[in-house]
């Protein structure tokens, strides 16, 4: 009898959850920590809903949502007019949080915070500044003893929204960069070594003395990698923080109706200059009504209760006016 009861229990546990809905998404690594938190918390509230997410990079997220192979995509770069036209249906670009991309480094013998000018960052990533003791670096870092050591540049190897934010910033502050490299999720880098994902770049910086790369703030914090302050458009050196990112959004251009906006190099005196929104890419018409209803419910939860979880992971929450506009647009999701 005891064996029979045990057998029935095992059979019951092996059965799938009746009525469970699974949503699949893919895209940016930049917001993965907060997305992972959100999907987990939403599942606790709605055990019948499972949201899976692959952090494969913004380029992959755009490709997959365009092809219709996922229920939603994610990108740190809003889709272009051409990408939206190529999609099989209307795609909504919905901002979720704001974050910062930071110049993270591994400089032996330098323990203080390093300051970077826009010209120095552009020069390093173009290969024009090759030594850590170059005057372009030392002149604004009095008191720090930089080694006569080669600079190793680390960049993303995959299509990346983090790369777009970085190159969008460099294109705004350096005419040479804009004309020779430009901005995109994937560019022809003048030099350097490639790492896959924010995780890959962070790992390479940790392993390579003399290196510098760019990662989303939380990846520098989680990996205990030093990162520098950057001189903003107002002339102040600002280190990435929730306050600096929020200031960047506050002083940025007015949010357009489709939410596609860049806030890099914002003019505010307290603004961190390499900041950005990140977006979920949501089909206005889902494959079936049940999926659309769940997506809309999650999005409404995300712009309200979900925003309360952002600061713990070093993201800035959406400005109230943006969240309010977004709630109106979410009504289009079916």
Where are these regions (language model features)?
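Flexible loop/hinge segments at secondary-structure junctions
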Residues: 19-334
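Positively charged n-region of N-terminal signal peptides that target proteins for export
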Residues: 1-4
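Sec/Tat signal peptide C-region and signal peptidase I cleavage site
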Residues: 11-19
